[in-house]
Amino acid sequence: MITKEDIVADVVTDYPKSADIFRNAGIDFCCGGQESIASAVNHKPNIDLNSLLNKLNHIDNTEGNSTINPKFLNVESLIQYIQSAYHETLKEEFKNLTPYMTKLAKVHGPSHPYLLKLQDLYREFRDSMLDHIRKEDEEDFPKLIQYSQGQDVQNIKIILEDLINDHEDTGQLLNVMNQLTSDYQTPEEACGTWKLVYQRLQNIERQTHQHVHLENHVLFKKVS
């Protein structure tokens, strides 16, 4: 049973579908997930604690029971899971989405200047994430695996702190894009490309929150 004393990030780790409930309540389970549910709700005057707990305790986890629970993977297997589920898919999505983002800004940017700003933010987010993923795959993750196997790795705490700081910067960029688009609500005049871009940006946001949660609150805990 999930209680008000449970830590938000731990709940998402054990019950992945709870991420949607926390997201809808505006509760950060990613970079700010290390607080109790009660404490998180205290910052949200429009959220009823008992109602939230009721929703959390009625999560249907039948689908999750048949899938991998990353919590029980060792460090090397967990890293492989992260790379397959998030790194590779995100790189592919950036490749596919960028032409649509370019088209949207070119066609509708002159009459809707905030779309030009959105394009700049998207490019910044894309480039920083690609660089971050490359660094993790080529430099940081191999060191985490070595450390988990008992090998001597210098400055492991600094490595983790740097990665967490990168994640916080990523979260801030996502928040700015979310605010700029009013939580990806398209206007009435939005064309198909506009709707497509917003939908896929929103999906990237959700996937990135889950991605960062898995690294910050599961992987890094295993090696800290």
From Swiss-Prot:
Single GO molecular function: metal ion binding
GO cellular component labels: cytoplasm
Cystine pairings recorded for this chain: none
Keyword ATP-binding carried by entry: no
Pfam short name (any one): ScdA_N
Keyword S-adenosyl-L-methionine found: no
Location(s) in or outside the cell: Cytoplasm
Swiss-Prot/TrEMBL keywords: Cytoplasm, Iron, Metal-binding, Stress response
InterPro entries according to UniProt: Hemerythrin-like, RIC_family, ScdA, ScdA-like_N_sf
Principal subcellular localisation of the protein: cytoplasm
Tree of life domain: Bacteria
Family that this chain belongs to: Belongs to the RIC family. ScdA subfamily.
Subunit structure: Homodimer.
Functional summary from the UniProt entry: Di-iron-containing protein involved in the repair of iron-sulfur clusters damaged by oxidative and nitrosative stress conditions.
Record-linked PANTHER family: IRON-SULFUR CLUSTER REPAIR PROTEIN YTFE
Name this polypeptide is given: Iron-sulfur cluster repair protein ScdA
Organism: Staphylococcus epidermidis (strain ATCC 35984 / DSM 28319 / BCRC 17069 / CCUG 31568 / BM 3577 / RP62A)
